């Protein structure tokens, strides 16, 4: 059973990791609303499903109760189970909710590291929510475990056992400044969201479990 659960978590992580890495900014509409365009249409459809008790808005800036239109709801309910599994994230949690223990978070961190880790991914609240959603649906972690120390400088996880820290980085001039996505790329969203105005990126190196930051 453990092997089967690990396989399911691995398959789900591929989809969530893809969303973490592939979401890019879309063009700004005449009224200034920032839209999201996923490099894969299926990923965008997946993100709209969200949690079992709510769905993500198209902007993914916050969780709302029901952003889907009547036709979209009908389309989702008529999908075959196999198709739904192939296309998007689980609509319902796969395990019971619990407060993650130290061992849970250690195992979770090493699992993510083995699957490619979070290194090189710009931090944003949207991406934090995606990681939270994966932990909730596949591992049963109650929301609220992902918290970091304040800046400036390196942000360490407050929850003992989670081994990924956030490092401030300099924004490189590159694709993030392209006309089609510069307003929503995480390298620019992060300074707007961060009280210190820093651009943060998850570190690819796990911190030592005994490291405790106050």
UniProtKB/Swiss-Prot annotation:
Homodimer. Interacts with host CD247/TCRZ; this interaction induces down-regulation of cell surface TCR/CD3 complexes. The keyword Lipoprotein applies. Transmembrane segments: none annotated. It is a lipid-anchor. Belongs to the lentivirus primate group Nef protein family. A lipid is attached at residue 2 (N-myristoyl glycine). It is found in: Host cell membrane. The N-terminal domain is composed of the N-myristoyl glycine and of a cluster of positively charged amino acids. It is required for inner plasma membrane targeting of Nef. Residues 80-86 are annotated as: Acidic. This is an African mandrill isolate. Keywords: Host cell membrane, Host membrane, Host-virus interaction, Lipoprotein, Membrane, Myristate, Viral immunoevasion, Virulence. This is Protein Nef. GO terms for molecular function: GTP binding. Residues 27-48 are annotated as: Disordered. One of its GO terms (cellular component) is host cell plasma membrane. Residues 129-145 are annotated as: Mediates dimerization. The keyword Ligase does not apply. It holds the Pfam family F-protein. Seems to play a role in optimizing the host cell environment for viral replication without causing cell death by apoptosis. Enhances virus infectivity and pathogenicity. Probably involved in viral immune evasion mechanisms.
